[in-house]
Amino acid sequence: MTKMKIATFGFTASLLAVAAQAATPPAIYTAAQATAGASAFSQNCAMCHGANLEGGAGPALVGQAFAAASNNYTVGAIFTELSQQMPAGQPGSLTHTQYEDIMAYILKQNGYPAGTTAISYDKAMGDSTPLVSQVK
């Protein structure tokens, strides 16, 4: 019986470790991109989406109202919308770098950690990474 309890405990601990690892969002942008993105967002997006991404004339870009798991959003889908349709009235008018940086800022504000590899325009367009806000 004791061996069974130990085995069960070990199995349960393994499952919890796997679940915790799966719940950690990937690091797909750099801190420098998110910093630059905050400035680019403030200049080009905040007037519609709010200074804190809370929404206004445009939808919120942070939290569960934006990216709940049930929405099935991906980084690629959101980046494509961002880079092809924004800013409103001037779609596609920013540089690739500005779009990359704004996406990094949105990811940061939604609880995604920064990493050592920069998000790139071409990679972001087809990125199938689920976008689920870690902000409740």
Which positions does each model-derived feature cover?
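Gly/Gly-Pro-rich "capping" loops immediately C-terminal to redox-active cysteine motifs
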Residues: A31-A34, E54-P87
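Flexible coil segments in periplasmic/lumen-exposed cytochrome c-class electron-transfer proteins
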Residues: P91-K136
